[in-house]
């Protein structure tokens, strides 16, 4: 990351210089960053609560584990992305947060999340809000890919991969989508992905083997993997471009 460097230690304005913090040191500055002409300071409390509850890092003496450089960097990068989302005019509604939570976490109950992940209810809500915001930024910059990981076909009860059924044929045709011509019972284009995969292994709409279904599965998975990799690379390039514009200072951490 351009502009990144580790600063000197010390408390107060200079930040944290020990592995543990007392209660009154939680609001000490542990890092600062400049992005788009704006300078922001980060306190130990903010860095810790970006991933944990204070109680989680509190020891038996009433002190708190100082946030690591990795935790702080993660927090700063997240803030830069959120700043970018704000610049793009991206916001999320309560309904969108609820949908995101249910899709990604399995529940939209913030109390349940708090208990499950060891954070406060307010933290859980904030994490969902930020994550949903970044998801919208991702879709805006990368695109909302329709690619989804395929589900493997059900193995035959007898373990014979040559076992044939209409279910396996339906499975293949469903994965192939528009590449299959249902009116003619064959491939629309001999040069299409699935047509090539089955060039020497024909099947009908009424019957296909488990082995053939697995061929379709591997084909679908390769397509999914390729699209996912492309999207990941595009997002990484975008995010790194933002990070390169930031100057980040971390002050004397030893956690």
Residue ranges and their predicted role:
Residues 67-85, 89, 96, 101-109, ...:
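Solvent-exposed aromatic/hydrophobic patches embedded in short alpha-helical segments
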Residues 1-67, 178-255:
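Short, low-structural-confidence N-terminal segments
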């Amino acid at each position: 990351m351009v502009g990144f460097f580790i600063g000197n230690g010390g408390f107060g304005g200079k930040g944290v210089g020990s592995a543990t913090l007392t209660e009154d040191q939680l609001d000490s500055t542990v890092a600062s960053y400049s992005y788009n002409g704006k300078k922001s300071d980060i306190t130990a409390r903010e860095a810790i609560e970006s991933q944990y509850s204070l109680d989680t890092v509190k020891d038996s003496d009433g002190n708190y584990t100082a946030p690591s450089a990795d935790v702080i960097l993660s927090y700063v990068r997240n803030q830069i992305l959120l700043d970018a989302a704000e610049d793009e005019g991206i916001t999320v509604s309560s309904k969108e947060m609820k949908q995101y939570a249910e899709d990604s976490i399995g529940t939209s109950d913030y109390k349940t999340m708090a208990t499950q992940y060891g954070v406060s209810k307010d933290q859980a809500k904030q994490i969902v809000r930020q994550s949903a915001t970044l998801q919208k930024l991702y879709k805006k910059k990368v695109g909302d890919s329709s690619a989804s990981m395929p589900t493997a076909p059900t193995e035959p009860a007898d373990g014979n991969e040559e076992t044939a059924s209409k279910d396996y044929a339906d499975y293949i045709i469903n994965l192939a989508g528009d590449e299959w011509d249902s009116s003619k019972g064959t491939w629309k284009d001999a040069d299409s992905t699935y047509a090539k995969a089955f060039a020497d292994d024909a099947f009908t709409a009424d019957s296909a083997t488990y082995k053939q279904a697995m061929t379709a599965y591997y084909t679908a998975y390769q397509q999914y993997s390729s699209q996912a990799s492309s999207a990941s690379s595009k997002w990484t390039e975008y995010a790194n471009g933002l990070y390169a514009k930031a100057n980040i200072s971390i002050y004397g951490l030893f956690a």
